[in-house]
Amino acid sequence: MRFWIDDLRNPKEYVQDWGMDDDIWSRSFEEFMMHLQIHVQGDQRIGHIYFDYNLGTGGTGLDCAMLVTSKDWEWALDDHSSWSSHSSDPYGRAKIVDLMDAWRVQTNTV
């Protein structure tokens, strides 16, 4: 299962095989939170998350990264989970990747 988090860019224009599996496009922090609750259950794990930083109003990609690495949701990630940021905002992109990488080191899932 892959997540594309971006309010404007269509994942089909950026990810060659988008839509082949259980791919989910979240356009806001609120949508991402809702999609986690609906689609990630039981033994399902997140395969990859593509983060944008600026999501319009009501949260950022960094908020999404903070949510998925929180004690309530970190179970949805495993040692096969990966992430990237396609944000054009260098500050936001670095903050997201740094947080996700720090989570990986802290949880020893390297």
Task: Give the location of each predicted region.
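Catalytic phosphate/metal-binding cores of nucleic-acid and nucleotide-processing enzymes, i.e., regions
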Residues: 1-110
